[in-house]
Amino acid sequence: MQIDLLLQTRMSFCLVEIKRRLQIGREVMDEMREKVRRFSPPKGVSVRTALIYDGELAPSVEADGYFDAIVPARRLLGL
């Protein structure tokens, strides 16, 4: 498993998953949970999660509230 993008601030890490598929389902949350479980930040540093996606996102992914941020690639690119 690889972390697609890792952002760091003084007190937190943000693990970013980037997905480009026709259908993006709940399995994306399972994959990220495993990455977070394996990630070992220094003590006192929080871990946040984000998803950048291109495709059709299953409504349950957003409704679940697991990701701290969900960003469509089109918005990121200003399209």
Question: Can you annotate each of these PLM segments?
Answer:
Residues 1-79:
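A cross-kingdom feature that marks ATP-driven nucleic-acid transaction machinery
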